[in-house]
């Protein structure tokens, strides 16, 4: 009843404005109407892309079928698998095309590395409403940009609008089990040279099972000072506070008694953690007035993470054990990049990047174990000072593109050297149709990452041993209106042993006036991954009511055959793979209805239509379950305001 009341109030509040939107001046095909105007003439219009030739996704890729976080957004795209650990949990995004057992992607935000420093990144620190674009760096070239990056990099490009008027955006989502999510985004222009961006979000969840509630607050602000067309300053402040109960999954992981949550007994009823994450960054961009082909980009950042983990704290029985840990990590970083843009002619250009990273990372971990009258405590302090130099070259001539790069780093006393090269050639048939051939290879020399999964572990890793490995891929893309097709083959070699030799990824689709379809099929030869993943999204779209409603409705399907997903340990934040894990398959079908009218996007999702019991982590089922009566999983609205 409470959820229905909130929905009615929202619709009542918004409906007069919806009906009042009679102008066709707005582009209804644009899902996010807050766009940058010519007002910001002093801004250096160089984005936060790590590489100007990267593939990017924008809000149109996730606003229509109502994705709640970064993991759900990427799970729709080829190449990604998520290990779900409950609503608001530390869900991990894996690179399905990686040859490494440690396959978690590396996350950057506006060009700054966030993951791999404190060994994990909680995706709940990011709001969907703050994301403008998502940059994907290829597996071939990703390691050139960050410390210990052995898989694909995802770079979140946050919204950075600069408009001559006060503007705001509200995103509200309502989910099952009293899950409510709201996020506000504001733009305050103070002058043609100064503006302030502000965001505030809250996410609350009562939980489908015992001890599964969570509460999350996010706050972010950004101050832009455009001193001149040659010098820009940007200051970011982000803070996230997350409290969540940790039930460690369900005991009856393969039983269908989840139709009634009463019979779904959780592993733990007295376990929780509290997380505080603070991020500060000062960005300086400089283009010398006399040298427009140069761009200097400097970031001074600090990340402060504190976690409290509590087991047995509320249990008053004398013969029960208790375990408390605190983890505190601070990352001070200096990043400097120098870009050289050389345009030889209209069809020939060269871009060169030279950069350096230096970080100082103190970490403190304390723990207390109590059983009866015995108390065991420990304190661990450590410090890391990784340093790296790197460079990348991009060259384009007509339809041929070439890229190469090298990175040397010292981390924890280990020296690593990485290099890569990739190229592509596009044969254009006409303005819209083409055939593209691409290939790439990279090499790691004396890499300091153990082959086995330790990225999300807080415990000491095994001592690394020097070795050489490489990753190479080749593929072809075809676009012939209205269809497109892509086929990619890739191999992974470690010390001469091919352990990922027969993997491939293919995607295809069609785009017509009223119907679109996207399909992908990928294989893996690694035992801890499914043999293959099939994904599809088929939808109908049209402009209705005299072009005032941009309407879309479709089906979203995912299937993975029987496999043994990993177990998750919330104490050490570790994923482990075992032959004893239950073997399951995954099948999910969602139906969604969405539309944009005036300044608002509205979406409804009917989730898991076949009521399938799905897992991507061995004992954590997806919460989108409950039969036909509970099929309407989510409602969301994204509303733009202009004052």
Language model features with spans:
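Coil residues (strongly favoring Ser/Thr
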Residues: 26-27, 32-33, 41, 53-56, ...
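Extracytoplasmic beta-strand/coil segments of soluble accessory domains associated
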Residues: 29-46, 71-113
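Periplasmic plug
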Residues: 46-54, 93-140
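Exposed, low-structure sequence patches enriched in small/polar residues
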Residues: 119, 170, 278-309, 327-643
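A beta-strand signature from Gram-negative outer-membrane beta-barrel systems
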Residues: 125-171
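Short strand-turn segments of transmembrane beta-barrel domains in outer membranes
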Residues: 158-187, 207
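Transmembrane beta-barrel wall of Gram-negative outer-membrane proteins
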Residues: 180-204, 210-244, 273-282
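Flexible loop and strand-edge segments within Gram-negative outer membrane beta-barrel domains
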Residues: 232-288, 305-330, 382, 442
């Amino acid at each position: 009843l409470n959820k229905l009341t909130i929905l009615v109030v929202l619709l009542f509040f918004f409906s007069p404005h919806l009906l009042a939107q009679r102008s066709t001046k707005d582009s209804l095909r644009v899902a996010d109407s807050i766009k940058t105007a010519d007002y910001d003439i002093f801004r250096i219009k160089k984005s936060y892309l790590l590489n100007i030739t990267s593939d990017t996704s924008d809000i149109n890729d996730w606003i229509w079928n109502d994705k709640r976080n970064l993991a759900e957004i990427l799970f729709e795209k080829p190449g990604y698998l998520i290990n779900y650990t409950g609503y608001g949990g530390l869900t991990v995004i894996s690179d399905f095309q990686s040859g490494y057992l440690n396959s978690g992607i590396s996350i950057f935000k506006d060009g700054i590395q966030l993951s791999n420093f404190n060994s994990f990144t909680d995706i709940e620190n990011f709001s969907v409403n703050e994301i403008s674009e998502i940059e994907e760096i290829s597996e071939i070239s990703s390691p050139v940009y960050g410390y210990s990056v052995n898989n694909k990099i995802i770079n979140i490009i946050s919204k950075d609008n600069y408009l001559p008027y006060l503007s705001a955006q509200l995103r509200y989502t309502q989910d099952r089990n009293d899950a409510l999510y709201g996020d506000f985004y504001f733009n305050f222009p103070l002058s043609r040279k100064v503006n302030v961006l502000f965001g505030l979000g809250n996410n609350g969840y009562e939980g489908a099972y015992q001890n599964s509630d969570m509460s999350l607050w996010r706050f972010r602000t950004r101050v832009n000072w455009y001193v001149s067309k040659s010098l820009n300053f940007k200051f970011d402040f982000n803070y996230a506070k997350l409290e969540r109960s940790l039930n460690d999954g369900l005991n009856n992981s393969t039983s269908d008694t989840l139709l009634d949550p009463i019979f779904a007994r959780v592993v733990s009823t007295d376990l929780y953690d509290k997380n505080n994450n603070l991020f500060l960054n000062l960005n300086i961009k400089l283009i010398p007035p006399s040298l427009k082909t140069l761009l200097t980009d400097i970031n001074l950042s600090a990340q402060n993470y504190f976690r409290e983990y509590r087991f047995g704290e509320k249990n008053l029985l004398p013969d029960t054990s208790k375990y408390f840990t605190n983890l505190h990590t601070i990352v001070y970083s200096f990043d400097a990049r120098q870009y050289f843009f050389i345009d030889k002619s209209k069809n020939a250009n060269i871009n060169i990047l030279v950069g350096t990273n230096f970080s100082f990372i103190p970490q403190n971990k304390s723990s207390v174990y109590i059983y009866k009258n015995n108390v065991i405590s420990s304190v661990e302090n450590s410090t890391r000072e990784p340093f790296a130099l790197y460079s990348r070259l991009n060259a384009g001539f007509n339809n041929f593109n070439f890229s190469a790069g090298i990175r040397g780093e010292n981390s924890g006393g280990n020296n690593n050297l990485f290099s890569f090269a990739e190229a592509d050639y596009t044969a254009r048939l006409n303005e819209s149709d083409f055939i593209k051939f691409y290939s790439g290879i990279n090499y790691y020399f004396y890499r300091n990452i153990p082959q086995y999964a330790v990225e999300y572990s807080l415990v000491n890793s095994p001592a690394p041993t020097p070795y050489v490995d490489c990753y190479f891929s080749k593929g072809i893309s075809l676009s012939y209106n209205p269809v497109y097709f892509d086929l990619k083959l890739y191999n992974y070699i470690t010390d001469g042993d091919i352990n990922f030799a027969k993997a491939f990824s293919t995607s295809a689709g069609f785009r017509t006036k009223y119907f679109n379809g996207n399909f992908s099929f990928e294989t893996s030869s690694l035992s801890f991954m499914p043999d293959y993943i099939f994904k599809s999204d088929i939808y109908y779209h049209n402009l209705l009511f005299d072009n005032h409603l941009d309407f879309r409705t479709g089906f979203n399907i995912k299937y993975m055959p029987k496999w043994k997903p990993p177990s998750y340990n919330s104490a050490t934040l570790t994923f482990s793979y075992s032959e004893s894990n239950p073997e399951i398959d995954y099948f999910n079908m969602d139906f969604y209805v969405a539309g944009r009218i005036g300044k608002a996007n509205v979406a409804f999702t009917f989730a898991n239509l076949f009521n399938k019991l799905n897992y991507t982590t061995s004992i954590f089922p997806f919460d989108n379950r409950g039969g036909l009566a509970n099929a309407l999983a989510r409602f969301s609205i994204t509303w733009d305001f202009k004052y």
